Amino acid sequence: HRMLGDNVLHPIGWDAFGLPAENAAIENKLSPKDWTNSNIKNMREQLKSMGFSYDWDREISTCSENYYKWEQWFFIELYKKNLVYKKESLVNWDPIDNTVLANEQVIDGKGWRSGADIQKKKISQWFLKTTSYSEDLLGDLTELEGHWPDNVVTMQKNWIGESDGAELSFKTLINEDIVVFTTRPDTLFGVSFICIAADHSFIEKCNIDIKAYCENLLNKESNNKEQGSPEGLFTGIYAIHPMTKKQIPIWVANYVLTGYGTGAVMGVPAHDQRDYNFALKYDLEIIKVISNDDTDAEVYTGNGKLINSSIFNNLDSKIAVKSILDFIVEKNVGKSVKNYKLRDWGISRQRYWGCPIPIIYREDGEILPVDETELPIKLPDDIDFSKGGNPLENHPTWKYTKCKKTGLNAIRETDTLDTFFESSWYQSRFCSPNDDKSMIGDEANYWLPVDIYI
């Protein structure tokens, strides 16, 4: 591209935080900082000896305080706009590395580095509200059509996974509603059971045997897959069908995906293959509500005329979708919604070698970001890995601080940011690497947006 006359930015940098560096440092009895900087020094010398035409004046390292200062500043800006939050969440827990793993880091049910059997565990995690941008992300894919391979655009659309449907509220005999998501409200009268995910909040209302079953189910690899044989357990609790007022059983099932929709689905075995397989296995009622003269299949998933559907009988199923939606909205038992497979991004990790999250927990119960004048919040150098896990959690002084605004005692957040957080923005920092007044300075305007990024 230089030979074609284009201005080419060819920088070099080091994606230097993370679990691999931390583990390697521990194995070599060095601090992660010394281990990482030593490796960077060696690699820099090797690359320079090869004569690559990198712009070394733009060199950055993600573990540099000058770099992660702006990452912390950005986190605080997101916090101010309510785009980051903390909640208890079911995660992939590596019992050897003592940290959360992303789904991509779990291979055949085992940790990608440790080889440990991954456990499902609920812990408090920080999340980035990527779901707030689901519609924008999907819409912007149209700008790639004709410029990117069709399979890449399709893959992205499927990853975001937009679904039009409805949320319906089912009352239960223990006075707690269960909300289900469905893309087929026209099959509402065919519901003969409800299935919930093993981590659904409703499980807390169940007996100890159900809770133990769910814990075991969550630790099975099959729980994260849509394929495989159906498996479930009756909770002993019934819901009330919002239309027919019949009692329908509530089951835990392995084919209800955790983290998608509401974590609860309505079982319509005559018109959904998974529901049908589940109903056959556990001898549950099968109610046909859509007829089609062209097929006598046990499971019909297409369109047709409604039957066994009260006042909606004989309606075409496509028309019935709107009619039933209007009815449930009028009766205040449901609403029309868009759902997405895209989930909010869990960005915190229970390890030392990462960017400190600039949050404090004040003694009066307030959770708030540090004052921006305190940035960067630096990692301590005097760390002890002998106790295992995250040494920040056990540090005798670093985690204890005071709120600058009130003077009240506070404890620092001891989780650090996922390394993908660092690598999500360094391409922009390359364009103004030495700016000490802003995350991305005016110098970047010359380069951004780029025509080609490799």
Model-derived regions, located:
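Amphipathic alpha-helical
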Residues: 130-163, 191, 196-233, 373-402
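A short acidic-Thr-Gly-centered motif at the start of a beta-strand
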Residues: 167-176, 240, 258, 405-409
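Conserved active-site neighborhood of enzyme catalytic/cofactor-binding cores
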Residues: 2-9, 107-112, 237, 260-271, ...
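N-terminal catalytic cores of NTP/NDP-binding nucleotidyl/phosphoryl-transfer enzymes
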Residues: 1-30, 36, 59-74, 182-183, ...
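Catalytic alpha/beta core of large soluble enzyme barrels
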Residues: 7, 200-294, 298
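A short catalytic or substrate-binding loop motif that flags glycine-/basic-rich loops and adjacent residues
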Residues: 160-164, 185-188, 229-233, 242-244, ...
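Conserved phosphate/anionic-ligand binding catalytic regions in large, soluble enzymes, centered on
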Residues: 178-200, 345, 351-358, 416-430
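Residue patterns forming the tRNA-binding/recognition surfaces of aminoacyl-tRNA synthetases
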Residues: 28-178, 264-376, 383, 390-393
